[in-house]
Structure formats: structure tokens, C-alpha cells
């Protein structure tokens, strides 16, 4: 009963720490589109794509899936931070930059999720 909760909790802690660290290091580089937020969403998309394909072909305990997907990726990626960054750009009249950021996050995340799936199938020889 407690293993699923512990799996999610541990994954969440690690994902949140990585998200915080990347935000600290990358967001100051290009504040108009904070690179930390972009990075965590793209990397999270890749990881979840790879993980979904992997776990679909794995006999591992479901707790590992909870650790990686629900815990780690759930805490690593961020829709709320993305949303406030877009609203802030819109409020400051930076419509073009807001549309660019939306495109990078949405299209990029979908591409990286597909790349994660493709990487698993390539590595696994499927």
C-alpha cells in the first residue's frame, strides 16, 4: 500500500529539485523566454515518451512507472510556470515573444515526446 506513495514522493522530490536547479541556472541566460522552464518541459517530454514505451514492454513493478512518470516527470515539468510566463509577456505587450514561447513549449514538448518514444524503440530494436 505504501510503496506507490513512496515511489511518487521520491520521484517528486528529485524532479522538483532538478526543476529548481535548472531554473536557477538557465532562466537568467535569456529572461524573455526562461530557458529553465523550456528545458524542463522538453526534457520531461522526452523522458515521459521514453518511459511510456519502456514500461509498456517491461515486467517491472508499476511502482517504477509511478516513480518516473507521476513523480519525477510530474514535478519536473511545469504548466503553471509556463502559463504565468506567457501571461507576463502578454501583459508587457510582448505578443510575438509570447507566441514564440507558446510554440516552443507546445510543439517542442510534442516533438521531444515523440523522440523519447522513437529512442526507446531504436535502442530496444523494435
Swiss-Prot record:
Residue positions binding Na(+): 74, 77
Gene Ontology cellular-component annotations: plasma membrane
One GO term (biological process): cellular detoxification of fluoride
Keywords: Cell inner membrane, Cell membrane, Ion channel, Ion transport, Membrane, Metal-binding, Sodium, Transmembrane, Transmembrane helix, Transport
Membrane topology, as annotated: Multi-pass membrane protein
Reactions that this protein is recorded to catalyse: fluoride(in) = fluoride(out)
Molecular function terms, GO-annotated: fluoride channel activity; metal ion binding
PANTHER family: FLUORIDE EXPORT PROTEIN 1-RELATED
Function: Fluoride-specific ion channel. Important for reducing fluoride concentration in the cell, thus reducing its toxicity.
Name the record gives this protein: Fluoride-specific ion channel FluC
Protein's organism: Acinetobacter baumannii (strain SDF)
Amino acid at each position: 500500500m505504501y510503496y506507490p506513495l513512496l515511489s511518487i514522493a521520491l520521484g517528486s522530490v528529485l524532479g522538483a529539485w532538478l526543476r529548481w536547479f535548472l531554473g536557477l541556472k538557465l532562466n537568467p541566460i535569456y529572461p524573455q523566454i526562461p530557458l529553465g522552464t523550456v528545458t524542463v518541459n522538453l526534457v520531461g517530454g522526452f523522458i515521459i515518451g521514453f518511459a511510456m514505451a519502456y514500461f509498456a514492454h517491461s515486467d517491472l513493478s508499476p511502482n517504477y512507472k509511478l516513480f518516473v512518470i507521476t513523480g519525477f516527470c510530474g514535478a519536473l515539468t511545469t504548466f503553471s510556470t509556463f502559463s504565468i510566463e506567457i501571461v507576463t509577456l502578454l501583459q508587457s505587450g510582448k505578443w510575438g515573444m509570447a507566441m514564440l514561447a507558446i510554440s516552443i513549449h507546445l510543439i517542442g514538448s510534442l516533438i521531444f515526446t515523440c523522440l523519447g518514444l522513437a529512442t526507446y524503440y531504436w535502442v530496444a530494436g523494435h
